[in-house]
């Protein structure tokens, strides 16, 4: 009997303990990341051949304390390595862990390697070679604080590499993880197993191999024990013969296929078919191309299990399509699989909530770096209503659940009815449909052509993060239902307070631009790459007013953003336009806006500069100035900080200097509670009239403080 250690992903230790016990292992003890056990030669080989959950099986050689790299080297060089392999082998050291003295795993691996080759030289042997790609022997070193364990890796390559998978889809599951998901799913062998989004088929193949009694490593050609001097060839051949005989006996039973894999991508299904063929279970699995929205139960007369690892995204921006996917998946499960069990694996608790099903059991697991959860469900066996039966028979496109977030959905529907008719009459294609009308749904919904943007406002600190997340997911589901927008044309963003220059930081790099019409102007928008879209919707009437005032005038647009006001001025007949902004990104955007509207002549100047510094040095005169500065800025690219309340009179003084006698300044900002310094204006010889109410469009009438706007002229 010898002591061995089987490694596994964290969270699977107890499951692995049960598996090893069933294979004949004794004295199984769970440890973090694996299981210690005792085994004779046959049980050792049986564990290597049959374990579906082990990542590696290690034979400990040295257990000792080390406090320095010299201790590490000494512990290695003293070991009788010739008892395990000879000098002709190619070997590799895998080193995991650190302590105070050995802080880098590469350094630790190098010291172990040095000790091994020096041992052979001291004993009159040639130095064995290191081979990082195809080693004959793997030495596994594990250091936890000062405790060192050196082991011989009997597996060779990691045991999740079964050998049947040629290639896979975009996000494959490790075979060991897939096996654990199957074992935890509650599926009973001999009953149907359906995977509606099967990808490369790993879940179904692992389950089919279990039922077919095919050892997961039956076809492995190379092992970590091949060059081990303790290898018992007779015991190994006996264990392998038993495995081959068992697989052949099950194959000859010729059971009817009851594993079913569906996927939308026919190319991935072809890979799944090849993988199943390689795994020896092609005769057990039926594959079919199909959309989850049209999923039908392939064996309605039987009861079985639906198992699935649906897509899940780390970035919030990928969520709308996933919300739709999980929502329709939940509907199809309840409609098509009454009385069945379901087991769904995902990294997103919120997405699982979109299934609208209550789980009776759940497990935590890791998929690479992602924290994931597996939830098991018992689908109700209640009789379907005639309406639901009809829906089952007429499966088709996704129809989001309109009964989610009903208060929000009703308000959104009411707003759409009012605003869309008005927008069409006005000739605008970008407008707001909802703006935090209800306190429980703290978000904005904007319409851009055939796209919808949902912007979540950052939740207050006293609001539970999970509750806020769930409300957002519910609101997106309701928005899909109410607007009928295609899922890939709904963009989701989290909006937070701007700090420094982060409004210029990219969220993505899709480069997807399209234009919207606004009172005859065509304006480029980008809904994905930046926090803002390139168009401030609340200033729509202000831009139109600027266009109406601009004919024959020299126009200045300061803090110009993407130059949309400049476009209106140019189309309104401005004699010249000057557009100034600190961001090259937005100036290039402004240039494209002008080109789109055939207003890109020499009279239209674009200047990249710190707006305040440029203004202080400007000698040109203007008839019409539009200035919409930030509320606050301390950007590193600006010489001084800026506060619109504190500094607006200084700004007006500089603007007065370049304003012609009959000129007009249109001044706007977004500071709530802004107070115009009328006394300061009087000292400058200027007067101001507030026109905020006149510049507030219908779609923003619920938010009267979104901006304030003023006409400033000479007294």
Swiss-Prot record:
PROSITE patterns: THUMP (PS51165), UPF0020 (PS01261)
Domain THUMP per the UniProt entry, residue ranges: 43-154
GO cellular component terms listed in the entry, alphabetical order: cytoplasm
SMART domains tied to this protein: THUMP
Subcellular location: Cytoplasm
Main location: cytoplasm
EC numbers, comma separated: 2.1.1.173, 2.1.1.264
Gene3D superfamilies for this protein: 3.30.2130.30, RNA methyltransferase domain (HRMD) like, Vaccinia Virus protein VP39
Reactions catalysed according to its record: guanosine(2445) in 23S rRNA + S-adenosyl-L-methionine = N(2)-methylguanosine(2445) in 23S rRNA + S-adenosyl-L-homocysteine + H(+); guanosine(2069) in 23S rRNA + S-adenosyl-L-methionine = N(2)-methylguanosine(2069) in 23S rRNA + S-adenosyl-L-homocysteine + H(+)
Record key words, sorted: Cytoplasm, Methyltransferase, RNA-binding, rRNA processing, S-adenosyl-L-methionine, Transferase
GO molecular function: 23S rRNA (guanine(2445)-N(2))-methyltransferase activity; RNA binding; rRNA (guanine-N7-)-methyltransferase activity
The organism's place on the tree of life at top rank: Bacteria
Record flagged with keyword Nucleotide-binding: no
Pfam family for this entry, one: UPF0020
Endpoints of the signal sequence: none
Coiled-coil portions: none
Function: Specifically methylates the guanine in position 2445 (m2G2445) and the guanine in position 2069 (m7G2069) of 23S rRNA.
Family indicated by similarity: Belongs to the methyltransferase superfamily. RlmKL family.
NCBIfam families for this protein: PRK11783.1
Protein name per UniProt: Ribosomal RNA large subunit methyltransferase K/L
């Amino acid at each position: 009997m010898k002591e061995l250690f089987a490694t596994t992903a964290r969270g699977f230790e107890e499951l692995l303990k049960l598996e090893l016990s069933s294979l004949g292992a004794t004295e199984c003890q769970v440890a973090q990341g694996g299981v210690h056990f005792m085994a004779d030669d046959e049980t050792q080989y049986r564990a290597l051949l049959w374990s579906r959950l082990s990542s590696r099986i290690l034979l400990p050689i040295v257990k000792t304390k080390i406090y320095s790299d010299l201790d590490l080297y000494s512990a290695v060089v003293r070991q009788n390595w010739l008892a395990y392999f000879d000098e002709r082998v190619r070997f590799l050291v895998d080193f995991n862990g650190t302590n105070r003295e050995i802080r880098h795993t590469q350094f630790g691996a190098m010291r172990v390697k040095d000790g091994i080759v020096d041992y052979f030289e001291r004993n009159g042997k040639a130095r064995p070679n290191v081979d990082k790609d195809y080693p004959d022997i793997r030495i596994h070193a594990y250091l936890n604080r000062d405790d060192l364990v050196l082991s011989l890796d009997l597996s060779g390559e990691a045991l999740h590499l079964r050998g049947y998978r040629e290639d896979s889809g975009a996000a494959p599951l490790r075979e060991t993880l897939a096996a654990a998901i199957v074992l935890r799913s509650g599926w009973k062998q001999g009953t149907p197993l359906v995977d509606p989004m099967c990808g490369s088929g790993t879940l179904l193949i692992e389950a089919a191999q279990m039922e077919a009694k095919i050892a997961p490593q039956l076809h492995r050609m190379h092992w970590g024990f091949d060059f081990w001097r303790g290898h018992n060839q007779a015991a190994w051949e006996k264990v392998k013969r038993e495995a081959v005989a068992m697989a052949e006996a099950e194959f000859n039973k010729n059971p009817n296929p009851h594993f079913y894999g569906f996927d939308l991508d026919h190319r991935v299904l072809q890979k799944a078919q090849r993988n199943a063929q390689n795994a020896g279970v092609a005769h057990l699995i039926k594959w079919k191309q199909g959309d989850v929205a049209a999923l039908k139960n392939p064996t309605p007369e039987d009861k079985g299990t639906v198992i699935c690892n649906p897509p899940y995204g780390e970035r919030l921006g990928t969520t709308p399509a996933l919300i739709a996917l999980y929502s329709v998946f939940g509907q199809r499960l309840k409609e098509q699989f009454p009385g069945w069990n379901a087991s769904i694996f995902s990294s997103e608790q919120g997405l699982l909530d979109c299934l609208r099903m209550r789980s009776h059991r759940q497990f935590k697991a890791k998929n690479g770096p992602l924290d994931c959860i597996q939830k098991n469900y018992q689908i109700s066996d209640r009789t379907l209503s005639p309406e639901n039966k009809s829906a089952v028979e007429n499966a088709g496109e996704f129809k989001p659940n309109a009964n989610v977030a009903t208060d929000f959905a009703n308000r959104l529907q009411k707003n759409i009815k009012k605003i869309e008719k008005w927008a069409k009459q006005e000739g605008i294609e970008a407008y707001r449909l909802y703006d935090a009308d209800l306190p429980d749904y703290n978000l904005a919904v904007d319409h851009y052509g055939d796209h919808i943007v949902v912007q979540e406002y950052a939740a207050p600190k006293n609001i539970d993060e999970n509750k806020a997340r769930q409300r957002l997911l519910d609101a997106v589901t309701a928005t899909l239902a109410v607007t009928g927008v295609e899922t890939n044309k709904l963009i989701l963003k989290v909006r937070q307070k701007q700090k420094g220059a982060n409004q210029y930081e990219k969220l993505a790099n899709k480069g997807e631009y399209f234009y919207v019409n606004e009172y005859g102007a065509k304006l480029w928008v980008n809904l994905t790459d930046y926090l803002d879209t390139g168009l401030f919707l609340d200033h729509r009437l202000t831009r139109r007013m600027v266009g109406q005032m601009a004919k024959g005038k020299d126009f200045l647009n300061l803090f110009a953003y993407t130059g949309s006001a400049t476009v209106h001025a140019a189309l309104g007949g401005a004699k010249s336009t000057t557009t100034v902004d600190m961001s090259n990104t937005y100036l290039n955007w402004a240039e494209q806006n002008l080109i789109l509207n055939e207003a890109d002549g020499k009279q239209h100047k674009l200047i990249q500069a710190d707006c305040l510094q440029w203004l202080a040095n400007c000698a040109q005169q203007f008839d019409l100035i539009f200035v919409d500065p930030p509320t606050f800025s301390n950007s590193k690219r600006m010489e001084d900080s800026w506060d619109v309340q504190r500094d607006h009179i200084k700004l007006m003084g500089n603007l007065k200097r370049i304003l012609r006698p009959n000129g007009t300044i249109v001044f706007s900002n977004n500071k709530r509670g802004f107070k115009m310094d009328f006394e300061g204006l009087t000292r400058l010889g200027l007067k101001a009239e507030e026109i905020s109410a006149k510049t507030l469009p219908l779609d923003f009438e619920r938010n009267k403080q979104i901006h304030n706007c003023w006409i400033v002229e000479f007294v």
